[in-house]
Amino acid sequence: MTRFQRVAVLGSTGSIGDSTLDVIARHPDRLGVYALSAYSRMDKLAAQAAACGAAVVVVPDDAAAARFRAAWRGKAAMPEVRVGPRTLAETAAAPECTTVMAAIVGAAGLPAALAAAQAGKRVLLANKEALVAAGSLFMAAVRENGAELLPIDSEHNAIFQCMPQGARAAAPTAPAPGVRRLLLTASGGPFRRQDPADLHEVTPAQACAHPNWSMGRKISVDSATMLNKGLEVIEAHWLFAMPSERIDVLIHPQSVVHSMVEYDDGSVLAQLGQPDMRTPIAYGLGFPERLASGVGLLDLTRWGRLDFEQPDLQRFPCLALSFAALRAGQPACVALNAANEVAVAAFLEGRLRYTWVARVIEAVLEWQAKQASVTLTSLDDVLDLDARARSFAGNLGLA
């Protein structure tokens, strides 16, 4: 009999959180909500908690807790309100919780995701930064504590589904036998055909207008710059123990083929589906079984054709910078992510031009390369380097 799962949805008010709660609500016999967390939207968090019957909510500070309590309109008892990053990690590791959806955007989601892995949970990983900034630490925690790691990014979920049946270890230490390459697909975002010379005047609204996916503002900008795909390359390296030279990116504007695995015998296995995050979320929640997701079926006759092309690195310099960071090592990946978060925040606030996002990242990577060699053996090491990289980026006069 399938075990009933009590899920902590970290970052519940974002698009991944919404989709996760939608899938959970479709399977009340198998799935329930233990905890929710949010950073700012307390009205929405209160409505979600009332609808799903969460036992716990986690908020960042006392002011947010007061806003949550003021917004509560549920007929049932108010959930326990926990405050601060430490309680977020404790909630992710709580014995009452079986499964953690790690969907907090950015490095802020790293400590709780790592705590879930250290507690041996089923971790549904939608937070790229856990692997980009702390890949070796995170994968070691999965292996050493018997955690179950299921990637939720559509690309990595697709690769996971296309891997050999015997290669589904939670944290492999070598590439799966017979696998030659991983092919990550990318839509190309809203500027796939735009002249690079015209990108200087791009506005936040234009960058956030993704042609296929509904996403938050930060990840929408990352998709436009293809830094998002670069982070996914780094993530794929850790998830599947695949060296960078065996990971390729293809532009696929229809977003129907979510990624592919090429085998030594010439076979290429692909996972296709509608561009709806409920599909990989349902896969992660139900694994190894399949759950209804609420996503409509794919009609290939409607598409008629599927296109693929190589990415233009002049238009997408952030993708090239990501491959360079992966080749340079984990400290460079920490710096890459930190610089991007600072630069994208500045762009969204109107303080930085779109084309300067890549320049900030490049400058921070050059700064990191000149630092004394550092070994990232603990979460504190990672967070210290992250803070120093953010400080350097913020003081460039560019952000």
UniProtKB/Swiss-Prot annotation:
Binding-site positions, Mn(2+): 153, 155, 232
Pathway the protein takes part in: Isoprenoid biosynthesis; isopentenyl diphosphate biosynthesis via DXP pathway; isopentenyl diphosphate from 1-deoxy-D-xylulose 5-phosphate: step 1/6
Cofactor field: Mg(2+); Mn(2+)
GO MF terms, alphabetically ordered: 1-deoxy-D-xylulose-5-phosphate reductoisomerase activity; manganese ion binding; NADPH binding
InterPro entries: DXP_reductoisomerase (IPR003821), DXP_reductoisomerase_C (IPR013644), DXP_reductoisomerase_N (IPR013512), DXPR_C (IPR026877), DXPR_C_sf (IPR036169), NAD(P)-bd_dom_sf (IPR036291)
Gene3D superfamilies (alphabetical): 1.10.1740.10, NAD(P)-binding Rossmann-like Domain (3.40.50.720)
Residue numbers binding 1-deoxy-D-xylulose 5-phosphate: 128, 154-155, 187, 210, 223, 228-229, 232
Catalyzed chemical reaction(s): 2-C-methyl-D-erythritol 4-phosphate + NADP(+) = 1-deoxy-D-xylulose 5-phosphate + NADPH + H(+)
EC number: 1.1.1.267
GO biological process: isopentenyl diphosphate biosynthetic process, methylerythritol 4-phosphate pathway involved in terpenoid biosynthetic process
Disulphide bridges, residue numbers: none
Similarity comment: Belongs to the DXR family.
Function: Catalyzes the NADPH-dependent rearrangement and reduction of 1-deoxy-D-xylulose-5-phosphate (DXP) to 2-C-methyl-D-erythritol 4-phosphate (MEP).
Protein name: 1-deoxy-D-xylulose 5-phosphate reductoisomerase
The organism of origin for this protein: Bordetella parapertussis (strain 12822 / ATCC BAA-587 / NCTC 13253)
